[in-house]
Swiss-Prot record:
Plays a role in DNA repair through recruitment of the FA core complex to damaged DNA. Regulates FANCD2 monoubiquitination upon DNA damage. Induces chromosomal instability as well as hypersensitivity to DNA cross-linking agents, when repressed. Targets FANCM/FAAP24 complex to the DNA, preferentially to single strand DNA. This is Fanconi anemia core complex-associated protein 24. The C-terminal region is distantly related to RuvA domain 2, a DNA-binding domain. GO terms for molecular function: chromatin binding; DNA binding. Keywords: DNA damage, DNA repair, DNA-binding, Nucleus. One of its GO terms (biological process) is interstrand cross-link repair. Gene3D superfamilies: 3.40.50.10130, 5' to 3' exonuclease, C-terminal subdomain. The gene is FAAP24. It comes from Bos taurus (Bovine). GO terms for cellular component: Fanconi anaemia nuclear complex.
Amino acid sequence: MESNPPDSTGPMHVPFGHIVANEKWRGSQLAQGMQGKIKLVFEDGLTPVDFYLSSKSCILYITEAELVAGNGYRKRLVRVRNSNKLQGIVVVEKTQMSEQYFPAVQKFTVLDLGMVLLPVASQMEASCLIIQLVQEQTREPSKNPFLRKKRALVSEPALLRSVQQIPGVGKVKAPLLLQRFPSIQQLSNASLRELEAVVGPAAAQRIHAFFSQPR
């Protein structure tokens, strides 16, 4: 298995249909939830990445404890975001304890970095989500849901679920918005009038307000 030097954001060789996991997750509930359902390989020196789903797509996982503790997770996100070699999505534990901190991480991840953010209630839910995304990628490798494209596909589960979390959107409006604005970047640059034409004035106000926050 080819691996990166410590603290690297370079590509990783990942066999098709496998997940390469950071050694720190060995024995965790998250890893146990995936074992037996997908081929999991542990590697040292994956910092700042937690899981590689393909050679250029990865997951950055923010635990409840990390979210409550402060903004220490931000450096990891920025390093992957600034890498031209990796496309990362962020999975965050949104629990009763950490829920009050979710708007801040959402603003930083989606608004400031333009990255996909997926909230989960537990590590077991996260394991199911990661398996689902890898299976989606395995079924349709040409429609890799982690790779940023000029035009995103509405069926991409990661992008769709991330947009659903934006205030004022939800499950019904997210596909409509992605048909008109195929990426988070395009959605963030949409005018209030353009948003109103898709989702109506009330939802448009909330969405526009989210993307108009000071950065």
